[in-house]
Amino acid sequence: NLLNTRYIIVSPEALPLQNRFALGNAWFVERATLVENADAELLAIKTIDPATEAVVDRRFADQLTVVEQPGSETDTIYLTSYRPNLLTYEARLSADRIAVFSEIYYPYGWNAFIDDKPAGHFRTDYVLRGMVVPEGTHTITFRFEPRSYKTGNRISLAGSSILLIMLLYAALSALKTRRKNV
């Protein structure tokens, strides 16, 4: 349900079963329960309703500016664009709320933005992404921008530039030699 599994395939011969309890690509919870560590997080998940409550490791407490906020029927969040390295959501909220995203939390390279401004995100329910979204209408974006990729691109650009300079030098040297011999 947390990972938005919409269909369950029991056997190849049978029709897939629809999972009516899948929570969707993202949803708002009414409260967050802070726990001491990952082990406590795993234990606490068994005791909550993930549609209304999230479990958060205490080391992410500084990013959790809202711990409890009752829901509103008008609050919505939708996935509007999905690419492997870019996820875009549209959200409308009547108050600051905690959003849980049905995506695996991986802090190395994933950056979060609200209206193109950097925003913090944290691990919730042991494996998912969570974020406090402020009141109002917002575009939320998650971009995969790993440092290793950027560093590799810079090294490739430098290497290609050096190679190009060497090729130009060799071509100019050959041209000079040819002109002297003629």
Q: What residue ranges belong to the model's regions?
A:
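A cross-kingdom signal targeting lumenal/periplasmic-facing segments of multi-pass membrane
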Residues: 1-36, 66-73
